[in-house]
């Protein structure tokens, strides 16, 4: 029996980036004033996800969040044919036909379990940024994976926080 997989690393990366975005927003670090802080130097990301950087006051640290892989059972799949368009002529390139198999899991409940050490969420802005990033996935605002312009990777759900 085949199953589709949503790897924890993919979800973790997307949530880390979105957490950095919301932390910058809450702390008024906007890109136009050159104070926006990238994910690898962002307080929220450092507190929750850790870093491999070793520069100045930033030291390597392990992440304080554990994400689970999600396996999707009983999925329907569609095979989508694609062609490659020649950018000079606008025509189809010879030998550039390929197919993509897409899993669909409409109306199927998926559970992504995330464990975070309490100390990582002590700062109010860090906690709010992380929770808002998670809520963005539940609201369908943060798609995961490729092909999102075709509607792939859109999730709608609920956020259940347990202390």
What does each model-found stretch correspond to?
Residues 1-163:
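Small/polar/charged residue-enriched interaction surfaces, especially the RNA/DNA-contacting tracks
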């Amino acid at each position: 029996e085949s199953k589709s997989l949503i790897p924890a690393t993919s979800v973790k990366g997307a949530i880390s980036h979105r957490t950095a975005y919301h932390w910058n927003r809450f702390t008024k670090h906007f890109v136009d004033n050159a104070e926006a802080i990238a994910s690898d130097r962002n307080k929220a990301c450092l507190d929750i996800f850790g870093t491999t950087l070793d520069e100045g006051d930033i030291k390597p640290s392990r992440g304080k969040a554990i994400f689970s892989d999600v396996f999707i059972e009983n999925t329907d799949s569609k095979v989508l044919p694609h062609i490659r368009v020649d950018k000079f002529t606008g025509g189809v390139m010879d030998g550039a036909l390929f197919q993509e198999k897409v899993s669909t899991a409409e109306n199927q409940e998926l559970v992504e379990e995330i464990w975070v050490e309490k100390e990582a969420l002590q700062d109010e802005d860090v906690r709010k940024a992380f929770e808002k990033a998670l809520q963005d996935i539940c609201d369908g605002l943060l798609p995961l994976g490729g092909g999102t312009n075709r509607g792939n990777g859109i999730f709608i759900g609920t956020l259940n926080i347990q202390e």
